[in-house]
Each structure stands twice: as C-alpha cells, then as structure tokens.
UniProtKB/Swiss-Prot annotation:
MF GO annotations: DNA binding; DNA-directed RNA polymerase activity; zinc ion binding
Chain residues that bind Mg(2+) 2: D300, D302
Family affiliation: Belongs to the DnaG primase family.
Zinc finger (CHC2-type): 38-62
Presence of keyword Metal-binding: yes
Cofactor, how bound (note): Binds 1 zinc ion per monomer.
Organism superkingdom: Bacteria
Cofactor: Zn(2+); Mg(2+)
Positions of the Toprim domain: 250-332
Protein name as catalogued: DNA primase
Organism in which the protein naturally occurs: Rickettsia bellii (strain RML369-C)
C-alpha cells in the first residue's frame, strides 16, 4: 500500500516514540528524555536516548538514529513505508486512502525521483582528473567527493543521449528540472559544464541538484528549479546527514553554501546544513528546531551576510521561546565558513561555535556598532528600533527579558558616556585642552602623589607608581625624583615644596599641586575625599584606556588570521566591558559620596 509522505508526519505527531521504544527497551527518565540500553548493539552502560519532544531516538554508541518509523523499521526489518503501515495498524491511526489525483501525483513523484537517481549516476561517471584536481585544490578529499556523490555535467549531448537511450523523454527530464529550453526552442542540459551536487531530502532521496560553474561564468551557482519533489522553502542541503548530529548536540548550524556544508562535514561538523541560496523560511526553522533547541546562523561576514541575518532575525522573533533559540557566529569580513575551517583549522571553527553570540546580542551589534548617537533623535531612533524588535516576540517572558537586556545595553553604552560630561564637576578627569587622555591620567597620578602622599603606604599602589611607564618623559623624571625624595630620603610632604623650588621640576610641581589644577577635579581636593574610590577610579580608567588602545591595534582592518588572534580579541572585548561596568559603579559610588558629604 502506497502512503502519502504527509502521513508519516501524522504518525510522528500521534504516536509517542517512547511508547514504541519501551516495548523493546527498558527506559529510564533522565533530564526530560529517556535512556536505555541500545537494542542495536551490545553495551553495558546505557547510551540510547529517546526524546518525545524531538520525536527522535539516538544512540551515542553505534550512532543509530531516526524517528518512530525508523525505529520500527530497524527493529522489524520492514521497509520504511511498511513500518508506517504497521504502526498505524498497531495504534489505531486511520490510513487515508489516496484519491486518484494523489495517486497520479505520487506516481509522478516516484518517476522524478528515479530519474534524478539516474542523473546522479551519470554525473558521477563523468568526473575527470581535472575536476577531481579542482575539488582537491579546494581541500575536498576523494572520500568526501564520494560521500556527497559529487559529479560533473559535461558539455555536449552526452547527457541527453544517456536518457534517450533509456527511453526517457525531454518532457520527463523537464519535469525533473534537468533540462531547459532556450528562446529559439533549443533544449539544453541545465547543469552543462558544472560540478553537480545532489540535494537530498530528509529521507535521503535526491530531489534536485546544485551546480557550480567551472572557470568564469554566471551564475556561479545554480539550483534545480522547483518541481513536485523539490521546494526550496522546505529543503535544506545536508539535512539528511545533519539530523542525528543536531539531535546529539542539541543545535544545528545553518550556513549559505554547498561547499560550506561539505567542508564543515569533512572537518567533523556534521550538524551543518545550508539554505540553498534562498532566504531562510519558517519551515526551515521549525525543521531544525525539531532536531535541536538551538539554530546557529553562520553567514558570510560581509554586508550581504548582515542583511541575511536581519531577515532571519525578523522571521525568527515571533517563533522563539526559551526552548527555541537562535544564535550567531560572527565571521571576520571576507571570510566564509568554507575558508574559516580550511584556512584556519578545526580548532578555530570550534572556538567560533563556543563563542557564538545570542540573538539579543546580535540585534544590539547590528543596531549599535559603528554608529554615532550624538543627538537625542539618534538615541530615540535606536530605542524605537530595539522596541520594534521586542514587539515581534510572542513569548511574553522572553519579550520582557529582551527589553531588560536592551535597557542595560543602552545604559552601559550611552548613558555612562553622557555621565562623563555630567560628572566632570564631580569626579571625572577634566578634559584639558592640549592633553591626550593618557597624558591627563599620567598627570593625575602625579598630582595625587603630591596631594595625598600617604597613598604610598599601600604596597600595591607604590609598586604601580614605581613601574608606571610614562608617555611624557619629563613627567617620568619628576616621578622618579619625587619618589626618591619621599621614599629614599624620607623627606616629609610639607618639605617638598621648599626642596623642589631649587630644581628643574619646580614648574611642573606648581602645575600639579594647585588646588584647581588641570588634572584633578576640585572634588578630589576635599579633605574628606574617599582615597580608595579615587585610586580605584584612576587605576581602572588607565587600565581601560590601555585595553582600548591595544584592542584597536589588534583589530586593525578586522583581520584575524588564527585562533590565537581570535581568543585575544575575545579577551579584550570581555575585559573592556567588565572594566567599563566597574567604572560605572565607581562613578555612582563617588557621586553618592560627594552628595552625602555636601549635606
């Protein structure tokens, strides 16, 4: 009896896979799933897992995997179709009879599937040493070429002759999406002079092809047209291979191209699929979420990749919840996933996965990074855009979390910057004309020594001041002289003025010691100032400035060549955010201290 493919989905939805499995396996509940001894290989420790929510089984030992129908097929030895009939009978699920129209549709589908299998055999037979060499130069091994059934469609009429010899007509080839017709009526092979890559559905049936041009020519990549067996909005390249790994890891990685998938699978990342050069659809997302809770988008690091990310974000926001997640791998500009793993290695790509960013963080980076928010209108527009994203989230709890996240980001990145201006009259460094921020900080450290020499009693502070490398050499000489007098010669702070007057450092001493000098705010000169807060603020501001300068240096032109560079960039980003947050807390503490003591 022929079943409609849609009926398979009915069975998956109607029958709990755990109910079927436990007839053959003793299952134990664990973390929302079930575990037991695998029925397909000998083992002493349970490695066989079953998930009703994912409607899937997977063995970590022998890698057996599939849905409830596949399990029945593996246990009984029946075909997939016959296993579905058995399940329907056992569980009282009515099997709908096919209408005449449906019978004709599925007969046509079977015919097309058979033709596509024949086409793939032909394409594989046409691989030449030149084509194999081209693929090998792209780091695709002969084993991978065989695994993915990569072939070649030659020029000329060999393709048409192959099928005509089998009594397959041009009409049939056209329905299978293998030939086209020119304006003059001439029939031509759609993939002529292209490397062919078969596209398989979830059942491992070839439903179409992708073609990659050899040499120059446009389009570089070409997909089969949509047919009764191939709809781009439903199909993901590599899905038949990825589903087991996605279930095991609880995430899928979504890329753009065939060779991205092939290279990543070859490198061991078998949870990768591609969207066949078309926009991601809701069907794609739901299909991937059935295999794992998280979808990781890894798109090219160019403007087109960013635009594709924005489209996917807007599509996904109404669908996400605590169990359906989207995250992103940000590739350096000019790098695609294929390059990332072939040029930089497996460890580099693993690190990219481990350091992926959340959907909320991706939205923030898209809306904030590289833009100026000098006016109230700029900031209002940012807030409006972020609220628009949040409003699309259906899950109320998640929507509230996104609001809080964006509010925190605005506070950390915009409000605290405004506080630099507001707090100039309270506790921040004056923005003195003619001095860089680094020079202001260096002068502030020396001014602090003159005003509060007792800080040198703290060992860590004394060591920091002693080892500080000044950009201003005159200031460094003054530091050395001052510390020598205070520490080595035990000169009292009150006696320094008389001594320095006889040296070449008198002018700089006067500049640094005046109560309203350029380098310490008047708030610092109060008798009841909190020295601990003051020192921490200056030290962290100096540290942050050096972090920012080093980060700007290593990210120049956004070129990341190896995993060490990537880890270094990641460290600086995290450390900068951490210190900036600590400075914000110190700002507030200092302001509160000043206010309390002014009452």
């Amino acid at each position: 009896m022929k079943l409609a493919p849609e009926f398979y989905e009915v069975l998956r939805n109607r029958i709990n896979i755990s109910d079927v499995v436990r007839q053959k396996v003793v299952l134990t509940r664990k973390s929302g799933n079930y575990v037991g001894l695998c029925p397909f290989h000998q083992e002493k420790t349970p490695s066989f897992t079953v998930s009703d929510s994912k409607r899937f089984f997977y063995c970590f030992g022998c890698k057996a995997a599939g849905d409830v129908i596949k399990f029945t097929s593996n246990i009984s030895g029946l075909s997939y179709n016959d296993s579905a009939i058995k399940l329907a009978t056992d569980y009282g699920v009515e099997i709908p009879k096919l209408t005449q129209k449906q019978k004709e549709f599925y007969e046509e589908s079977d015919e097309i599937l058979n033709i596509l299998e024949l086409a793939n055999k032909f394409f594989k037979s046409q691989l030449t040493p030149e084509i194999l060499n081209y693929l090998n130069e792209r780091n695709i091994t002969n084993e991978t070429i065989k695994e993915f059934s990569i072939g070649f469609a030659p020029r000329g009429n060999k393709f048409e002759k192959f099928f005509h010899d089998k009594n397959i007509t041009n009409v049939q080839l056209g329905k299978a999406g293998l030939i086209g017709k020119r304006e003059d009526g001439e029939i031509y092979s759609l993939f002529s002079n292209r490397i062919t890559i078969p596209i398989r559905n979830i059942y491992n049936k070839i439903v179409g092809f992708g073609g990659r041009v050899i040499g120059q020519g446009l389009p570089k990549y070409l997909n089969s047209p949509e047919t009764v067996v191939f709809q781009k909005s439903e199909t993901l390249y590599g899905e038949h291979k990825a589903i087991s790994s996605s279930y095991k890891k609880n995430y899928s990685i979504l890329v753009e191209g065939y060779f991205d998938v092939i290279s990543l699978h070859q490198a061991g990342f078998s949870e990768v699929v591609a969207s066949l050069g078309t926009s991601v659809t809701e069907n794609h997302l739901h299909k991937l979420w059935r295999a794992g809770d998280e979808i990781i988008l890894c798109l090219d690091g160019d403007s087109a990749g960013i635009k594709a990310s924005v489209r996917t974000i807007n599509l996904a926001l109404p669908l996400i919840n605590s169990e359906k997640k989207i995250s992103f791998i940000r590739l350096p500009t000019g790098l695609d996933p294929d390059d990332a793993v072939n040029k930089n290695g497996v460890d580099f790509f693993t690190k990219l996965i481990d350091t992926r960013i959340s959907l909320s963080e991706m939205i923030w980076q898209i809306e904030y990074a590289g833009k100026n928010f000098k006016t109230a209108e700029d900031k209002a527009n940012l807030e409006k855009n972020l609220k628009d994203y949040c409003s699309k989230i259906s899950d109320s709890n998640l929507r509230a979390s996104y609001y809080r996240f964006f509010k925190d980001q605005i506070w950390q990145n915009l409000v605290t910057k405004q506080q630099k201006t507001v707090a100039k009259n309270v506790n921040l460094l004056p923005l003195s004309s003619g001095y860089s921020e680094l020079e202001i900080l260096e002068h502030a450290f020396c001014a602090l020594l003159i005003k509060f020499p007792q800080i040198l009693q703290e060992f860590e502070i004394k060591e920091f001041i002693l080892n500080l490398n000044f950009s201003n050499k005159l200031l460094e000489e003054f530091r050395n002289w001052y510390l020598s007098e205070v520490i080595d010669n035990a000169v009292e702070a009150g006696e320094i003025a008389a001594i320095v007057e006889k040296t070449s450092f008198f002018d700089i001493f006067l500049l640094l010691s005046e109560a309203d000098n350029l380098f310490l705010d008047i708030a610092f000169n109060k008798d009841n100032v909190r020295l601990d807060l003051l020192w921490q603020w200056l030290y962290k501001r100096y540290y942050l400035l050096n972090l920012q300068q080093e980060y700007a240096h290593i990210t120049k032109e956004y070129v990341i060549t190896n995993i060490d560079d990537y880890e270094k960039v990641l460290f600086y980003k995290k450390e900068i955010l951490k210190i900036a947050s600590e400075l914000q807390d110190l700002n507030e503490s200092f302001i509160n201290h000043i206010i309390d003591n002014s009452k």
